């Protein structure tokens, strides 16, 4: 039995240590805007999105957060990958990230032998980290796909 409809990513929600700093960073780097506050028991979330909501990132704080730095070896989120159409798009993003002082991740969850954009059999990837050390990837399929 096949799934009824293809699914696609609706949003990503991340717990952060400094909500205001993370909101500013994500808005600057991704060109998105604060859209909505979402109060919840023990904290608050802020939804950030572009105008057509094709990219939506929710950032949350929790009163009970241990305020430890993120590490992908713990159970839960490993990293977040965002899709781009071409390697040329990755190159433009590389320049954009550099303009904001964002550098390629010094460590990734797998070896990256090419810097800053790694070309692997299944595509090309640019890996960087947010202020809480969460690994973010921009991914483009192999050319010709």
Predicted regions and their residues:
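A cross-family glycoside hydrolase active-site/sugar-binding cleft signature
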Residues: 58-60, 83, 139
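A short, acidic/glycine-rich surface segment
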Residues: 43, 64-69, 112-115, 145
């Amino acid at each position: 039995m096949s799934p009824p409809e293809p699914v696609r990513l609706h949003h990503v929600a991340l717990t952060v240590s400094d909500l205001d700093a993370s909101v500013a960073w994500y808005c600057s780097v991704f060109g998105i805007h604060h859209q909505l506050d979402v109060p919840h028991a023990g904290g608050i979330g802020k939804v950030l999105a572009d105008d057509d909501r094709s990219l939506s990132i929710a950032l949350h704080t929790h009163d009970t957060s241990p305020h430890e730095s993120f590490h992908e070896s713990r159970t839960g989120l490993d990293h977040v990958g965002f899709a781009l159409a071409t390697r040329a798009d990755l190159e433009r993003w590389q320049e954009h990230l550099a303009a904001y002082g964002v550098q390629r991740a010094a460590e990734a969850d797998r070896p990256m032998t090419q810097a800053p954009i790694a070309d692997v059999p299944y595509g090309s990837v640019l890996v960087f980290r947010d202020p809480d050390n969460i690994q973010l990837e921009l991914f483009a399929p192999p050319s010709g796909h």
